[in-house]
Amino acid sequence: MEKILAINAGSSTLKWQLFEMPSETVIAKGMIDRLGLSDSVFTAKYGDNQKFKEVQDVTTHEMAATLLLTRLKELGIVSHLDEITGVGHRVVGGGEAFSDSMVINPVALDEINRLAEYAPLHNPTQAYYIKIFTALLPGVPQVAVFDTSFYSTLAPENYLYSIPQEYYQTFGARKYGAHGTSHRYVAHRAAEILGTPLESQKMITLHLGSGASITAVQDGHAVDTSMGFTPLAGITMGTRSGDIDVSLVAFLAKKLEITMPEMIDILNHKSGLLGISELSPDMRDLEETAATRPQSALALSIFVNRVVKYVGSYVALMNGIDTLVFTAGSGENGSELRADICKQLACFGVKLDEEKNNVRSQERIISADDSKVKVLIVPTNEELMIARDVMRLK
């Protein structure tokens, strides 16, 4: 048995899980929230439903990593740090340089830092944590698991933009996608639940959280995905606009007398469900107010509309669909949302079982027995996918 630590780091959070492998048992999990502030919060769940929480100053990433390893020992989760035999790190941007997860060496770490211009909010922090854990756990393999590597199988027809090709060749201007680790996990897990090889299925996975994306999977590989050069592209999201005419972006920047970075910030943080509803980016708030606020109802309708359009285009791309999978916050918990989406996909043979669909975040098949398309809820587990890759590669 081996203990593998999975790290999912953001600029102000550090999510972690410790697995016993290969049994895939969760030994402990938790997070450090509000990093960089005076009231950072460390939480852990471990053992027989034991919970631990503390508030203290965690002002640097070094402090966060050190605190995590210290608490693992002090709480008795591990007796010695050398019990940890591998660490896996989520890395958002792998560009074209990384078509698979890999054990990190200095050259690879430099490349991850170089790719920061493609994922400026994530790569620098995630690369830094790799460096920190390498120092704190000397000799322990550090494995980077890239969000983008699942999309290395996309054909040029699906990843290239219709712009002068010198921009792709010189600057790497192309679709990279995101949420790849989540889509990869739920696709494989759905195939396991159905008892059918993934390679024999035409599957569409819907990662519907505050950030949302859709991926088409055929012959066991991703063939297209809704997010693009950045996670701003694709369907309407919590605060992101999704697809938009770029001329409108320039037009609005001029009218508002703001810079292009300021305009992009609006599209990333003030648009989507929040922008349309003028209330909230949270699907639950919109569902609660839809009956009395037309803008809330409109935001929900637009979201469903965009999802259905992408699913329809992917069905055409793959010349059919066998399986539809819902995951992430709204996808796992939103029974009404799932019903609204599937109702508009009835033309493809999608039919829900109303009773089976009335669940929250529970792994199950929710399609009717006579549905031509299998519909499932599969709660995502990026950390487990990371741990599996560590075991495969270290």
Curated annotation (Swiss-Prot):
Question: Quaternary structure?
Answer: Homodimer.
What is one GO biological process annotated to this record?
acetate metabolic process
The biological pathway it contributes to is: Metabolic intermediate biosynthesis; acetyl-CoA biosynthesis; acetyl-CoA from acetate: step 1/2
Q: Which GO terms describe its cellular component?
A: cytoplasm
Q: Taxonomy-wise, where does this protein's organism fall, top ranks first?
A: Bacteria, Bacillati, Bacillota, Bacilli, Lactobacillales
Instruction: From the UniProt record, report the name of the gene that encodes this protein.
Output: ackA1
Q: Where is the active site?
A: D147
Q: What does this protein do?
A: Catalyzes the formation of acetyl phosphate from acetate and ATP. Can also catalyze the reverse reaction.
The protein's matches in CDD domains, at most eight in alphabetical order, are given as: ASKHA_NBD_AcK_PK (cd24010)
Task: Return the InterPro entries for the record.
Answer: Ac/propionate_kinase, Aliphatic_acid_kin_short-chain, Aliphatic_acid_kinase_CS, ATPase_NBD
Give me the comment on cofactor binding: Mg(2+). Can also accept Mn(2+).
What are the EC numbers?
2.7.2.1
Name the enzyme's class.
transferase
Q: Does the entry feature the keyword Nucleotide-binding, yes or no?
A: yes
Q: Which family does it belong to?
A: Belongs to the acetokinase family.
Kindly list the positions annotated as binding Mg(2+).
N8, E382
Q: Where does ATP bind?
A: K15, H207, L208, G209, S210, G211, D282, M283, R284
Where substrate binds, per the record, is at R90
Designated name of the protein: Acetate kinase 1
Q: Could you say which cofactors this protein requires?
A: Mg(2+); Mn(2+)
Mind telling me which PROSITE patterns this protein's record contains? ACETATE_KINASE_1, ACETATE_KINASE_2
Q: Which Gene3D superfamilies match?
A: 3.30.420.40
Its source organism is Latilactobacillus sakei subsp. sakei (strain 23K) (Lactobacillus sakei subsp. sakei)
